[in-house]
Amino acid sequence: LKMNVDDRGSFTEIIRTGSAGQMSVNISKPGVTKGQHWHHTKNEKFVVVKGRGLIQLRKEGSEEILKFEVSSDKIQVVEMIPGYTHNIVNLSETDELVTLMWCNEVFDSNHPDTYFDPV
């Protein structure tokens, strides 16, 4: 598998399908925020399997921020719906945050449907 690594951690596509989207694993270094974008059509689901984090969502055009504290101590799914900018923050100062991510569409670099906007 190809790990896309930078100073924030890594992002690795695990499974790509034509009909069921894709699964990926995201590793965030301590204190790092990832995301800060929204999609027109992509629907994503995040599941933290190691560590402790904060997922934040904000509907485009709104100032209200929805916050979800997530951790491997209580496995749950948080959904990123189209039209909501979102991020995930690693709340630990020492441990990595590992998140499984499912998206209903595979990533297409010619049509990324990813628009930067801080939560």
Give residue spans per PLM region:
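A short glycine-rich, His/Asp/Glu-containing loop-to-beta-strand
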Residues: N4-Q36
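Double-stranded beta-helix
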Residues: S62-E64, T85, V89-V119
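Short beta-strand His + acidic residue motifs that chelate non-heme Fe in jelly-roll/DSBH
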Residues: F11, G35-H37, I55-L57, V78-M80, ...
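Glycine- and acidic-residue-biased ligand/ion/polar-headgroup-sensing regions
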Residues: T41-E60
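Short, surface-exposed charged micro-motifs
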Residues: K45, K67, N87
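Short acidic-glycine-tyrosine-enriched beta hairpin
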Residues: K59-G83
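A short beta-loop-beta micro-motif enriched in histidine and acidic residues
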Residues: A20, V32-K45, S72-K74
